[in-house]
Design a protein with these regions (language model features):
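Amide-donor transfer/coupling interface in amidating biosynthetic enzymes
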Residues: 2-4, 31-154
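Catalytic nucleophile loop
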Residues: 1-25
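Class I SAM-dependent methyltransferase SAM-binding "motif I" and its flanking Rossmann-like core
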Residues: 28
């Protein structure tokens, strides 16, 4: 997907895969390392997450602090190349990463698909769909007669 310029959204394990794919590492069990946050999985948005000021995530969620859920015990340890941290929890664990440049790339450690009743979490999906539509449009070219678009073969 990255090589083709496709937008990528990684949720929970997907965010971890993005980091590992980019050469980063994971902490296998953060539960005993937590000091300021709950040690059990939470489906409700009871975890406080702070968003970086100049990030796409903050712009899409239209907030500086959000509530998030947590269903994982792993976290990013060493950040992968060409990624930047855009959200942290109260224990300082990475909760979201974005690509530094290139195609649209976002990985969130929580599950926004369970929180669609919050406008900010819907904003993540709105931004992803917009990026996907822009990608699709960029791959369209006029047909042989110049009237009907076809996908380019590149």
């Amino acid at each position: 997907a990255r090589a083709l310029g496709m937008p990528v959204l990684g949720i929970c394990r997907g965010a971890q895969f993005i980091n590992v794919f980019q050469g980063g590492t994971l902490c296998q069990n953060v539960t005993p390392l937590r000091v300021h946050t709950r040690h059990r999985p939470l489906l409700l948005p009871l975890q406080t997450v702070r968003l970086v000021a100049d990030s796409g995530l903050r712009r899409w969620m239209q907030a500086s602090v959000v509530g998030a859920n947590r269903i994982h015990s792993q976290a990013i340890r060493r950040l992968g190349r060409d990624l930047r941290v855009v959200a942290l929890d109260n224990d300082g664990f990475v909760q979201a990463v974005e690509g530094r440049d290139g195609p649209w790339l976002l990985g969130v450690q929580w599950h926004p698909e369970y929180l669609l009743y919050h406008a900010g979490h819907r904003g993540i999906f709105r931004a992803f769909v917009e990026a996907a539509l822009n990608f699709k449009r960029s791959r369209l070219e006029p047909g042989p007669e110049g009237d009907s678009p076809i996908l380019s073969k590149e």
